[in-house]
Swiss-Prot record:
The keyword Transferase applies. Belongs to the Fmt family. The lineage of its organism: Bacteria, Bacillati, Actinomycetota, Actinomycetes, Micrococcales. This is Methionyl-tRNA formyltransferase. Keywords: Protein biosynthesis, Transferase.
Amino acid sequence: MRVLFAGTPAVALPSLEALLAAGFDVVGVLTRPDAPIGRKRVLAPSPVAARAEELGLPIIRANRLDTEVQEQIALLRPEVAAIVAYGALVPPAALTIPDYGWINLHFSLLPAWRGAAPVQHAVINGDDVTGAVTFQLEAGLDTGPVFGTVTEFIRRDDTGSALLTRLSHSGSVLLTQTLSAVAAGTATAIEQTGPVSLAPKLTIEDGRIDFSVPALAVSRRIRGVTEEPGAWTVLAGQRFKVAAATLRPDRRELAPGQLAQAGKSLLVGTGSHAIELLAVQPAGKKMMDAADWLRGVGMVDGMVFGE
């Protein structure tokens, strides 16, 4: 089966590799254009583009599927398009180019968490279970009928990044199975049912920590936005990032945002009880263990996050 693969970030790579390993004829890759990365903002290809270059696959780089891009896709004569985190909408006119349309691998149990950041929202919301589905892409936002599902329990220490990595691998197997069924003529898609929730793309502001809410909600926020867009607060007027924390229900005397030292541990108060920060990044520094930051800063008495 001739497959156009549409994807951009590293999370899409397991699916590309799985399709190739299963013997699908990947006739081309659709990905976002090169983008600036790092502090020096050097232009670099997307992870999918970089891998496609290594494999010698034709690459279409586009932020939007205008008429010219649609013509490029049509020239590849794909029977189906597999899409995994491409990062842009597919217009109705492009949906009919492949014989079997576009089949999307989405990292939630639809119709829960439709949108660009389903895994992060699931962690922030405190969901116990999530998963991935393959579905037929249509004009609506993640509304198409579902071919298959895999489920994944959300662990108490899961970050959005770690959970997404696991789902990218289990989802790649599901995508391969779905396309195999489509090729064999045995695939069945079922309309979505159940409560709908939305998962819009997270902004930098979504990473701001509100220490006035209960500790569990603070922990979920930190885990959900790690690694993207990242959790942060303000200390002495400068941004202060947090990458890992754990609950400390034994310490309830701290006011929200108030810092305290307990041995080598860095504690901060919330709306219920303290949390212990494990990895932090002060302004202008690299990410470090909170204990190392404590040794460098000395006393934290009187310090309050958010000021």
